[in-house]
Amino acid sequence: MKFVDEVKIHVKAGDGGDGAVAWRREKFIPRGGPAGGDGGNGGDVVLEVDPQLSTLLDYRYIREHKARNGEKGSGSDMNGKDGADLVLRVPPGTVVKDAATGEQLCDLGAAGERVVIAKGGRGGLGNMNFASSTNQAPRYAEDGTPGAERDLVLELKLLADVGIVGYPNAGKSTLISRISRARPKIADYPFTTLTPNLGVVGWRERSFVVADIPGLIEGAHAGAGLGHQFLRHVERCRVLIHLVEGANPEPGRAPKPDLDAINAELAAYSDELARKPQIVAVTKIDVPEARAAGVKLQKLLGRRKKPVPVHLVSAVTGEGLDALLDAVGRALFKEARPHRGGGGKKLAKPRARA
């Protein structure tokens, strides 16, 4: 299935039905009074979270969405039927914005969560409502009001606990396939991963969701290499695994400059991304030069005023993966590191608005 994470749609709620002008026509009542019923209310446009969905693909091809109009009132005090609501199902993690202003209208995450995004028009009153002692035969009724309509932008942000970031071909897809049951496309060239992949990782008696974010390049914060689409998914992640390729065949590439370049892109996109907990790992250490580069980066970052741990891992042999997942689990669940001679102590939604 093609992954679609941003679409623009137009929604139109149903119009209210007009009230009726009618009169009583019963036998033996030659001068019956007003009997025009009210119009029905127009249907609302409702967004509902469907956990079975993982993409906005359906809305790529169908942009116009309209709820049913309310029916007109009729004689004999008969009110028109209300228009049916139109329910648009979206995947968890959908952010809804007004296309004209950019204002965020709601952030839908929980399964079954619903929000009325366009309110149906009100049905008009029939002439029976306007009868009075001074006007016993009103010859007018009220028109229904139009339903709301607006252009919307739907953005999908993946709901993952951990995001794996790094340059293209840094080994992100291989890692997620090794630590979870996810099976992304893997090949030895950049940009193999064109859409995010999700995998569930078991850790001790818990589990967490990992997203393999497609490779970032310099200028991603400004949209280079589809950077905006990719960085959007990192925003929801609580912890980042920053993969750095130890042995890179491209000239001018090395672990430390790669690490700094990606961190600069995260910071340029948003301060929040720059502040996220990050675990650094050098990949492909089954290759001797990659291991040597990883050790060098360990020493370099270890000399900082606030040392940064660097994990050396190989998704091929499995070396270092357990230690990496332990670091991720502790960061996620805020679990204290065990002391020598003592056991470790465990420490310890968006509301939508229309």
Curated annotation (Swiss-Prot):
Q: Which Gene Ontology cellular component annotation is one that this UniProt entry carries?
A: cytoplasm
Query: In what residue span(s) does the OBG-type G domain sit?
Result: 160-333
Binding, Mg(2+): 173, 193
Name the cofactor(s): Mg(2+)
Q: Does the keyword DNA-binding apply?
A: no
Cross-referenced HAMAP family, in alphabetical order? GTPase_Obg
Q: What does this protein do?
A: An essential GTPase which binds GTP, GDP and possibly (p)ppGpp with moderate affinity, with high nucleotide exchange rates and a fairly low GTP hydrolysis rate. Plays a role in control of the cell cycle, stress response, ribosome biogenesis and in those bacteria that undergo differentiation, in morphogenesis control.
Protein name in the entry: GTPase Obg
Native species of this protein? Answer: Anaeromyxobacter dehalogenans (strain 2CP-1 / ATCC BAA-258)
